Curated annotation (Swiss-Prot):
The F420-non-reducing hydrogenase is composed of three subunits; MvhA, MvhD and MvhG. It forms a complex with the heterodisulfide reductase (Hdr). InterPro entries: MvhD/FlpD. Its main location: cytoplasm. This is F420-non-reducing hydrogenase iron-sulfur subunit D. Belongs to the MvhD/VhuD family. It is an enzyme of class 1 (oxidoreductase). GO terms for cellular component: cytoplasm. It is found in: Cytoplasm. Its cofactor is [2Fe-2S] cluster. GO terms for molecular function: 2 iron, 2 sulfur cluster binding; metal ion binding; oxidoreductase activity.
Length: 137
């Protein structure tokens, strides 16, 4: 019996917005793939590029970071910091030969449960097309 591959997706979610949207999606029974594991952080601005690389090198096939919409950060400028880091990370991934599509940044407010479910479903489809992530040392 052969096992079919299922992606392992990590969603690093801002406590104030994207995590609340994930909670709302669950409460309203909006389905999203069980391949998505949500990790709550205080702010998307606290997500260091190393966290994303660490997730990929330890079994994640894709990582999506969710934060508050620009201008709505609970900590004022955290999401702008996340955006700057993300642009640098995408350049680094490309230089290393890693598909930048494996990593994504999304702005999802606490009231956007449906958007959360839709984005996770779409990201799952993207990762399935890319296939398993193979880290070569």
């Amino acid at each position: 019996m052969s096992e079919e591959w299922e992606p392992n997706i990590v969603c690093i979610a801002c406590n104030w917005c994207t995590y609340q949207a994930a909670d709302m999606a669950g409460s309203l029974r909006y389905s999203y793939p069980p391949t998505v594991k949500v990790v709550r952080v205080p702010c998307s601005g606290r997500v260091e590029p190393e966290f994303i690389v660490e997730a990929l090198t330890n079994g994640a096939d894709g990582v999506i970071v969710g934060g508050c919409h620009l201008g709505d950060c609970h900590y004022k400028e955290g999401n702008y910091k996340a955006l700057r880091r993300f642009k640098l990370l995408h350049k680094l991934l490309t230089e290393l030969g890693i598909e930048p599509e494996r990593v994504r940044l999304e702005w999802i407010s606490g009231s956007e449960g449906l958007k959360f479910a839709e984005v996770m479903t779409e990201f799952d489809a993207t990762i399935r097309k890319l296939g398993p992530f193979k880290f070569e040392r």
